[in-house]
A protein has these predicted regions:
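A short, N-terminal "cap"/entry segment at the start of jelly-roll beta-barrel domains
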Residues: 1-45, 55, 126-133
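Conserved short histidine dyad/triad with adjacent acidic residue
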Residues: 44-60, 97
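Residue-level recognition of conserved beta-strand positions in structured domain cores
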Residues: 45, 58, 77-79, 105, ...
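A short hydrophobic beta-strand segment most commonly corresponding to one strand
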Residues: 46, 65, 94, 109-126
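Short, conserved beta-strand element in jelly-roll/cupin
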Residues: 47-48, 60-75, 118
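Histidine-centered metal-chelating micro-motifs
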Residues: 53-55, 74, 93, 97-103
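Beta-rich strand-turn-strand
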Residues: 79-86, 104-109
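Short acidic-glycine-tyrosine-enriched beta hairpin
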Residues: 81-97
Length: 133
């Protein structure tokens, strides 16, 4: 259930899996489903098939936390994309504002991440590579 960012949320909201929508902003190699969006909050799920690698992107003025619920998430970042972390189920990955990165799924099964973002502006900005931006 996407909420109009211009309308404040009043009260508790329940969003069931079938109510999530395809997020407007996508990156090749992964699928994002939006559950909640307000002026300064974005919550959803991202899925990546085994062996897939997303394109390089960043999240502008949004701080991002990813919680790994299935599979594994390799996140490449840093100068030239030479740094990486690999999150397993139960791990959290923090991505600061504007950090150019890409995700891949090195596991044999599908990767699923719960994503929570706080900030504003465009949620996803796709770029040509780790040195772009």
């Amino acid at each position: 259930m996407t909420m109009d960012p211009k309308q404040p949320i009043s009260g508790v909201k329940l969003v069931r899996p079938e109510e999530r929508i395809m997020a407007a902003a996508q990156t090749a190699g992964m699928i994002r489903e939006e559950a909640i969006q307000t002026d300064h909050l974005w919550v959803g799920i991202a899925r990546t098939k085994p062996g897939n690698i997303s394109n390089w992107h960043h999240h502008g003025d949004w701080e991002t936390v990813a919680y790994v619920i299935e599979g594994a998430c390799r996140l490449e970042f840093g100068h030239g994309g030479r740094e990486a972390v690999v999150g397993q189920p139960g791990d959290y990955i923090y991505i600061p504002k504007g950090e150019i990165h890409r995700e891949s799924n090195p596991a044999e099964g599908e990767q699923a991440l719960v994503i929570v973002r706080f900030g504003g502006g465009p949620v996803v900005i796709n770029v040509d590579g780790p040195m772009a931006g």
